[in-house]
Every structure is written in C-alpha cells, then in structure tokens.
C-alpha cells in the first residue's frame, strides 16, 4: 500500500450517498430560521425517499459550525473574483461579480503571505458572513514590469464552507486561464450567472445579508453527509502529521479554546488541519454544548483579521504570518507545525501526554490498521478511514459526557477515579482537563480525584 505524505496533494473529494433529512415545521419554510442555539440557512425541500432495501442511516450528528444540510442545500455562490499581485500596488481585486459586493480584505485572504514562494496553492477563509475558497498560481513571465512573475488567485464566496470543494477544479483551471490570458472573464461571468445564490431576508432583516450563525454540534441530520465536507485522505494525514499530539489538540478543541496553527505556505493542507481539529470536538448527546461557544473554523487569517479575532472566545484558524506568535492575547493555543504550546499556566498540564492518551492513540491506530487490512483483502471501502476517525472521537466524547450527565443527575454528584477511567481518562493526568471541562460546560459534579501534587 502506498501511503500519502502530509505534503502530498490531497486526493479528490469523495461524496457519500445522499441522506434523507428529517423535516420539522421549523425547517419546512426555508429561508433563515432558528435551530437550537444558533441559526442557519436551510432549503425548503422534501426529504429524499429511501428505497425499500436501503437501511436507515444511524442518527448521529457531527458537524462543527455547519451551515448547510448536505444534499438538500442548493448552490449558493454569492461572489466570484480575481485577485492579482501588482508589483507597484501590491495585492488588488482585479475583477469581481457582483460588482457592488464588499470584498475588502479578500485580496489578502486569497493570496496568503509568502505565496510568492510556491507555484500553486488553495486557501479557505472567512469573509464576514461568508466563507471563501481561492486557488492561487504563480507563473514565470518575461516581463520587467511584472518582475519576472505573474501571480493571481481566482475565488468564490458562499454561506457554507462545506460546498466550496465542488468548485476546486474549476477554480484551478480558471487561475491558469487568467495567468495565460489576463482579462478574459467570460467563463467566470457565466459560472456566476449559473451558480449565483439569492439569500432570503427573514422578518426584520430587510434586504441586508444575514450574519453568520453557528449551528450546534447536536442536531438531527445524518452522519453520511459528513463525507462530502472533506477530501479523502484529509484526516489520515492529520493523524500522521501530529501523531500522539492529536490527543492534546482534542482536549483543547473540546474545551473550545482559541487555537491558531502556524505554517509557512502552502496553506491549503493547513486549512484542512483546521477542519480536522474542529471535528475532534463533535458530540451527539442532547443537552451538551448549550452554554459553550461553538468551535468555529476560521481557516486562513492574516494581520487584517486581528481586530475580529480580538472579540472571539473560541475559534480554530491557521496563518502564515509569524507575527501572530507575539500577539498572545489573540490565542490560547499556538501550533507551530508539530509543536503545540500555550502561554496560559493553567493549561500547561494539558500539554503532557499521559497513559490514557497513549492508549487511545494505540486503539485508534489499531482500528485504522484493521480497516486498511479489510480494504486491501476484502475490497470493502465502507466505512472509510475518515469515517473511522470522526466516529472514534465522537464515541469518546459521548462516553465522557454521558458519564458526566449521569453523575450530575445522581444524588451525591461525586465523580471518582473509577468514573475517570471509565471515560477513558487518566484520573491524575487528566484531572486538570476534567476540572476545565466541568467548568466550561457548566456540569454540576464534585470531583474527588486526589491531586498528586497536593497531599
């Protein structure tokens, strides 16, 4: 079997089978409606009818900060644009549709700092109420005016980051086209006319665009739709890159800490690490997460985002700008390639890998090897490795919160070392993590695990 390295191009996106979405009256009206602790845009469409011999999918729900409902959401491309690097003026928006849309800052988001060092890249980012995907390319030219290199990005904006992947190949082709034939926008204009979305204004919104809301991790839709939200190989590479440290990231993600990942370009694969990090914190138990902010994938950020990051209490993002490391007020956890660190004293214990972490990592790898073996020998690629990764952490998180909820509902509300071991945690090594978890989620239990440092 040939394994793909972390720096290798990710495999093409793979879609799973269509999923039937249970309807309730709040969802059938379409437009922007409230759901759980947030809001989201849903399309008014009847659920897909399941064939007689088709088993019902398990009712598990995962997506962190999801804004779309899988196969029932229509295309919603709200802008298409071309960004160029001008040797005299710097990054600038060369062309866009619609012409009156606010694209301030997109010229820097879609062409990451340091991009001149790579030949091509792709970048996910957030712009106000939208998410963007841009494909960048750098072509040598014999032009003194352009200083020997022509650099452009072609991108789109959408209310949902989970649908952007559909247009990756188109954007890659179009940025090459723009490099070779600058100023020819007919294909992009036709694409926008075909895919443009109309955002419905709800009561009291007038004609203004709705703000972004983050749906809770717990809702009714089905796991198989998750398969369209990431490229094949994404989470496998995530595990290989971080190794046992994914358990450290898991704890910080579950605590909804502000996580900033630094890496030099190319930034595309780092955007996938942002997404994978958010997936570590999925929970499908009712009653969990109502008092804690959602894990927000901001994807690529730069110095222009500092003001917006200052007011965020929870996010996962990546950057190519080393200056962020000095701005400690903006993050709780800083990841420099594979080095995970925090400047908060009370979070320092979470940086240590303990015996329970090693056991979880061993089990994860054991399950991965069994899956890969069955795929090779039996040719069975369902479930895939990505399913295994997401469900592994979902099960772990559910086990923790199920235990905590049961203890909080008991008469004495006492959480013991035996409970900790039953949750797959180290009673001493994870004591600080458990205390932070109880506080963050507002769970009323009494922790009676002795602190080995305080006899």
From Swiss-Prot:
Q: In its keyword annotation, does this UniProt entry include Acetylation?
A: yes
So where does this one cross the membrane? none
Enumerate the UniProt keywords alphabetically: Acetylation, Guanine-nucleotide releasing factor, Methylation
**Which residues does the record list as N-acetylvaline (modified residue)?**
2
Ranges for domain cDENN come to: 214-362
List each copy of the uDENN domain by range. Answer: 15-187
UniProt-recorded name of the protein: DENN domain-containing protein 11
The record lists the organism as Mus musculus (Mouse)
């Amino acid at each position: 079997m040939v394994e793909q390295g972390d720096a290798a191009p990710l495999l093409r996106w793979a879609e799973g089978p269509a999923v039937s979405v249970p309807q309730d009256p709040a969802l059938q009206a379409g437009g922007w409606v409230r759901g759980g602790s947030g809001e989201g845009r849903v399309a008014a469409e009847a659920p897909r009818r399941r064939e007689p011999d088709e088993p019902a999918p398990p009712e598990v729900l995962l997506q962190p900060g999801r804004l779309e409902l899988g196969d029932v959401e229509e295309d919603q491309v709200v802008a298409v644009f071309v960004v160029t690097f001008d040797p005299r003026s710097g990054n600038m928006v060369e062309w866009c549709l619609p012409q009156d849309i606010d694209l301030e800052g997109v010229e820097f988001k879609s062409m990451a700092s340091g991009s001149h060092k790579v030949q091509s890249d792709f970048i996910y980012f957030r712009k106000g109420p939208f998410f963007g995907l841009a494909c960048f390319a750098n072509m040598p030219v014999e032009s003194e005016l352009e200083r020997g290199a022509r650099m452009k990005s072609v991108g789109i904006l959408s209310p949902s980051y989970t649908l952007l992947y559909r247009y990756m190949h188109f954007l890659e082709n179009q940025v090459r086209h723009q490099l070779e034939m600058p100023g020819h926008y007919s294909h992009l204009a036709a694409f926008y006319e075909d895919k443009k979305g109309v955002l419905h204004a709800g009561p009291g919104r007038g004609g203004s665009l709705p703000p972004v809301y983050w749906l809770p991790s717990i809702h009714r839709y089905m796991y198989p739709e998750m398969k369209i939200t990431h490229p094949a190989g994404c989470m496998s590479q995530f595990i290989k890159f971080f190794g046992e440290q994914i358990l450290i990231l898991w704890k910080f993600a579950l605590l909804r800490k502000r996580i900033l990942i630094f890496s030099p370009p190319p930034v595309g694969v780092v955007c996938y690490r942002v997404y994978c990090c958010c997936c570590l914190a999925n929970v499908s138990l009712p009653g969990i997460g109502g008092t804690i902010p959602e894990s927000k994938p901001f994807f690529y950020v730069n110095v222009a985002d500092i003001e917006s990051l200052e007011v965020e209490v929870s996010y996962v993002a990546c950057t190519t700008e080393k200056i962020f490391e000095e701005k400690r007020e903006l993050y709780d956890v800083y990841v420099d390639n594979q080095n995970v660190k925090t400047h908060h004293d009370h979070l320092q214990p979470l940086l240590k890998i303990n015996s329970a972490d090693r056991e979880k990592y061993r089990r994860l790898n054991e399950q991965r090897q069994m899956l890969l073996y069955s795929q090779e020998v039996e040719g069975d690629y369902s479930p895939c490795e990505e399913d295994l990764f997401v469900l592994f952490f979902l099960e772990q998180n559910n086990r923790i919160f199920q235990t905590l909820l049961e203890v909080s509902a008991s008469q004495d509300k006492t959480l013991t070392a035996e409970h900790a071991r039953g949750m797959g945690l180290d009673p001493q090594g994870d004591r600080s993590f458990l205390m932070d978890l109880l506080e963050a989620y507002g769970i009323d239990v009494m922790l009676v695990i002795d602190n080995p440092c305080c006899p």
